[in-house]
């Protein structure tokens, strides 16, 4: 029994060391899955012999141990095969070789280059799903491991093999619309590309969340292999200055659903657009008709009006920044590191800071592509409280922290 406890301890310690190492070498990840295999094999054998506690570790049910051991064996053997190909010299993170990613659609292949595709159903921002698509898929075939390119369009998520068989769809948004949509309408946003699609009903035009109108293409969205034509801004369609405030009014703020679509004033050029059967989601803070009347009555439409910024009041609710200035700590690392760190801080050191944000990323130039590491922002009531936090809360290896003080200009 002592030998089994020692072997279990070594296997678990090996896993922890490899996780903290954050290696990009495939051989290190093979060692990790070998250790997982050893751990669950020992636990399975112990459970079969009636042992419920091995060392300081409770032994799970034998079915759980068996399933985890099978997963580890499959991952170990697959990675060993992959390491013998030209892809073995590429950088691989532990996340790239995780079981969850390996089993995500399309299943049983390794994936890299994750990005998020947003699908909005019924033109309702609250009825939105997010799908992960990977740029590179490493797939096992009869001829060995091959690289496939993946992407998204108005029809669904697809990949293209080197054999040149065209786009192979493994998830279709039309099927998703049948589950989540009531009207059959859906729209797709992939980075800086926008697609429109219809699964069951038809509509001439749909309102886009970024202030553009996209015409529906067909019963299954865009045809395979064909990109949607670029959408035209509303201002170019109407040809009237009255449409200027539409984008400014929409912005990216959505306070709740509206019960009616946009109504353009007579003479503004809006007659070329037919009202969508799907209500537009979002709140326009200015009335377009009244704004048009004001502009028509104005003696000089080129005269600029002074911009009045909204002032903070005591009834606004929660505010991260205080009028007298706030002390901050900006903490960055991998998404999992930051998430675990925030959990430990909230659980054990809640009295040492004031507020903590959720995990966030900086957005790159192309759509919703992430750049840099995951980050959280922690606020403090005073520099002394921040100093106490830094003194008593350790920062795990691989994470970075920066301190700064910010004050409100308006």
Swiss-Prot record:
Keywords recorded for this protein, A-Z: Activator, DNA replication, DNA-binding, Early protein, Host nucleus, Oxidation, Phosphoprotein, Repressor, Transcription, Transcription regulation
Protein's UniProt keywords contain Acyltransferase: no
GO cellular component: host cell nucleus
UniProt keyword DNA-binding, yes or no: yes
GO-annotated biological processes: DNA replication; DNA-templated transcription; regulation of DNA replication; viral DNA genome replication
Function noted in UniProt: Plays a role in the initiation of viral DNA replication. A dimer of E2 interacts with a dimer of E1 in order to improve specificity of E1 DNA binding activity. Once the complex recognizes and binds DNA at specific sites, the E2 dimer is removed from DNA. E2 also regulates viral transcription through binding to the E2RE response element (5'-ACCNNNNNNGGT-3') present in multiple copies in the regulatory regions of the viral genome. Activates or represses transcription depending on E2RE's position with regards to proximal promoter elements including the TATA-box.
Protein name as it appears in the record: Regulatory protein E2
